[in-house]
């Protein structure tokens, strides 16, 4: 990554300044082709730990390693030049202590080439966020539904559906803001609560299954493209294409051409040179 392309990327400070302004467009990418396709159209590319499910076929995000996340980030950074690339710290890479979290974050920035990291948790992670930001690590926070905590939560459960649940989540949002996070993802959260948090804090909120009032939105790219193993997506996803069908039809056509010996045709082969 050259110094020129680094300067061209959206910076954390410019993203923070978008609070209350034009909506921030975010998507995930784990590979060079997807990163290349979306780079000019989005503000943030999240190299999400959802790669464990989307790319590697796991049932949850938990199995993916930091080494593998860094490899995905390297591919995304090489194929992009405009968007801010944020690397999701995977489960087990940052929770054990402040120095542990810094070591993982340093690898994400130095080896992965990411411009920032994301970690899950509100008040319980505030000290970690403060420790990291004081040492030059830009942090995107993540509250609400926490995919890395599904074992203790008992599954993927939305939050803030009753007024009694609001206060702890508002406290989480305020805590990560005061700790120095430059933005916070609000996932799987009742719409009125997400809208209220967006009004209450001074950093951008990025919604996923939250509210149109958030300062930005994020989805898993393969979900909106209709490209998945199961074909199922969360109810908050709007599907903009059906690549499962498009790819399936293309491969079926290829297979038919091969079986009928229509492929390769003459234009797809190499003739002898004329002497």
Locations of regions flagged by a protein language model:
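Alpha/beta enzyme core
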Residues: 2-235, 241-275
């Amino acid at each position: 990554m050259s110094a020129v392309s680094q300067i061209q990327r959206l910076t954390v400070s410019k993203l923070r300044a978008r609070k209350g302004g034009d909506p921030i467009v975010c998507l995930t990418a784990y590979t060079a082709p997807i990163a290349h396709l979306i780079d000019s159209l989005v503000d943030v590319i999240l190299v999400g730990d959802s790669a464990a499910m989307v790319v590697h076929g796991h049932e949850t995000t938990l199995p993916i390693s930091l080494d593998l996340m860094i490899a995905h980030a390297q591919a995304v950074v090489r194929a992009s030049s405009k968007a801010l690339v944020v690397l999701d710290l995977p489960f087990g890479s940052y929770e054990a202590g402040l120095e542990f979290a810094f070591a993982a974050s340093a690898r994400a920035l130095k080896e992965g080439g990411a411009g920032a990291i994301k970690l899950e948790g509100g008040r319980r992670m505030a000290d970690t966020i403060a420790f990291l930001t004081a040492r030059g690590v830009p942090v995107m926070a993540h509250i609400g539904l926490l995919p890395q905590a599904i074992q203790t939560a008992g599954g993927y459960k939305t939050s803030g559906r009753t007024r009694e649940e609001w206060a702890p989540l508002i406290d989480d949002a305020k805590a990560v803001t005061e700790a120095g996070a430059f933005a916070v993802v609000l996932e799987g959260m009742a719409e009125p609560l997400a809208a209220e948090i967006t009004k209450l804090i001074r950093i951008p909120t990025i919604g996923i299954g939250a509210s149109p009032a958030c300062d930005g939105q994020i989805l898993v790219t393969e979900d909106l493209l209709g490209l998945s193993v199961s074909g199922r997506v969360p109810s908050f996803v709007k599907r903009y294409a059906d690549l499962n069908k498009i790819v399936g039809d293309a491969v079926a056509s290829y297979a038919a051409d091969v079986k009928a010996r229509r492929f390769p045709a003459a234009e797809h082969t190499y003739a002898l040179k004329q002497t």
